[in-house]
From Swiss-Prot:
Additional notes on this entry: This strain probably does not use sialic acid to attach to the host cell.
Homology family: Belongs to the rotavirus VP4 family.
Location of the motif YGL motif: 450-452
Site (Cleavage): R233, N234, R243, D244, R249, V250
Matching InterPro entries: ConA-like_dom_sf (IPR013320), Rota_A_VP4 (IPR042546), Rota_VP4_MID (IPR035330), Rota_VP4_MID_sf (IPR038017), VP4_concanavalin-like (IPR000416), VP4_helical (IPR035329)
Protein name listed in UniProt: Outer capsid protein VP4
Coiled coil: 486-513
Amino acid sequence: MASLIYRQLLTNSYTTDLSDEIEEIGSSKSQDVTINPGPFAQTGYAPVDWGLGETNDSTTVAPVLDGPYQPITFTPPIEYWALFAPNDKGVVAELTNNADMWLVIILVEPNVPQELRLYTLFGQQVNLTIENTSQTKWKFIDFRKRSQNDTYILENALLSETKLQAAMKYGGKLFTFTGDTPNAAPQEWGYTTNNYSAISIKSLCDFYIVPRLPRETCRNYINQGLPPMQNTRNVVSVALSARDVISQRVSINEDIVVSKASLWKEMQYNRDITIRFKFANQIIKSGGLGYKWSEISFKPANYQYTYTRNGEEITAHTTCSVNGVNNFSYNGGSLPTDFVISRYEVIKENSYVYIDYWDDSQAFRNMVYVRSLAADLNSVTCSGGSYSFALPLGNFPVMSGGAVSLHPSGVTLSTQFTDFVSLNSLRFRFRLAVEEPPFSITRTRVSRLYGLPAVNPNNAKDFYEIAGRFSLISLIPPNDDYQTPIMNSVTVRQDLERQLGELRNEFNALSQQIAMSQLIDLALLPLDMFSMFSGIKGTIDIAKSMATNVMKKFRKSNLANSVSALTESLSDAASSISRRSTIRTIGSSASAWTEVSTAVIDTTTATNSISTQTATITKRLRLKEMAIQTDGMNFDDISAAVLKTKIDKSTQIAPNTLPDIVTEASEKFIPNRAYRVMDNDEVFEAGTDGKFFAYRVETFEEIPFDVQKFADLITDSPVISAIIDFKTLKNLNDNYGITKQQAYNLLRSDPRVLREFINQENPIIRNRIENLIMQCRL
């Protein structure tokens, strides 16, 4: 029989090479994982910037900050803070454009009453009134005048415990910090001037250069102090001209030749980037009356956009995916009209978001051999929207709320798979923190849960946006006209969602092209792995590796997991019987096939309770049928035959997508199944949907359904797939009339009798088989 392929996969799917298992761990998508938070918890790759570990006191260590630089007069770059670190009171810095801006920053020690002090400002002796009533904090005071002949006016003050102040040219204005540490912030309006780009700074103390983005960096220095300089004894300031050596900090967007040989050159690319991304999701509704949802989950989302960088229009492409999701569920009850969500995904503080970024600039043309990869990005908050679950009757439950903030946590190389091309790209990893508000589902007990649910993660936004910059050094050919190929060795994730989606659509469309007479013949063949996959191009060359991949994927299927659980249950049942051999209960007679020992209470059990019990039993009858095969045809024979036919007809099937397709087919083909057991003239039939019938073969007259007898028969008698179910049999008998022998043959799913009815163009039998074929969908 064709179902041999499933038994063969179940038998062989537990043998796999260790190297294959290790390789799969790094590439397979994980939907329900336990996270151990850490700086690089989610990748098997080393961090980009290695720490220095323990450092001897005599070792010189380059500080994290850009600086310190010696006092000098210079013109600072726009959008960069000049962070002043004076050691003593007095004039800290002089800033002017020699037109309408003369600004000086004065530092006053703590506990100074109001008094006049003499300072030398721009080469002139000037008396200024200063005061600092704080007992512990130092005070930075801004004095400004608008022309050379004006007097200085006190404009701004900063009370500081860290003795740090900063100035920056940005947006046509000059900004300094104001307020009181640890809550100091940049001025809201700044100092207006007609020619702010020409402002130069004469620093009278050591200073650092800090970029404006991310905004929190300089603010944290002002309020919390400079970061520790590790174990160095002395920090020696250098001339500002030494800053030219650190080439990646000279400008935001530039290409620098680091080294060059006859065949290769090293190019350093510095870029500021705007990352736009969005989440994708899928909401799957269960069958039935319309009150139940089976899945709400995240999916990878591609997004293409353009933005301007230094006057140049950039085309960018991002792919957003999540890892470490948390599975939630809601069950409103066991009735068919009770609201149920079997599984919905939520990302929280133990989750990660990956954003793969590519643009059409020179930096991404030859991104194969890369070193010194670093990035600096802002954070962003993602807030969830509302989703209304449309029920057939009654008020609609609404899931709303939820928010998380994304914080940069690392960068690696990756490859994006778009609809047309594979792109070498950068993967930015973000750790998550939960934010207000929590999410809830109205008209349920679900309330005040934190995280971002997958139901509406974009909240009507077209995209989320993150600004930042990156720097890398790439080894490329010396001639810019050459391009190196994409290297799969640097691929972090290969997203097959698009290929699988197209293949599923093709498979579902092929259902109408299957000839039923040929299908019955194919279902009778003993299909093994080689004959099943023989229609795929290149199978002979890669048969071993492909079969291994199929078995590894099948090992994690629901069918394989059910076999494992059943094996454990049978073992438990056997040990229980050996301990209590004198007791015969429903639990021991039905054993692990039924699990109804606690469900069958008495003969007055309500109909809905019987439905629940029979549905529970029926879920395991597929395994019972596979374990004890009869001569009749079963649902898995039809499922495997349809799978074989579609594989042969498919134009998109490939070895890399085959494992997913075979596994999905074993789980999703023919979801509505019914099984029967026979006791002389009586037949008991139950379906996975909870429907059950008991009837006599002679008259097709229904009789009361005895759950206990049904459970006993399942243990002692063969289980038969109800290919032609009770309703179809009764309809066939009422309209055409069938003999008792024909009825028995159809009840046993005899393939020869089925073929005869199909060849005779019997519309009732053909309609039933067509219905089963149409249920073979992915």
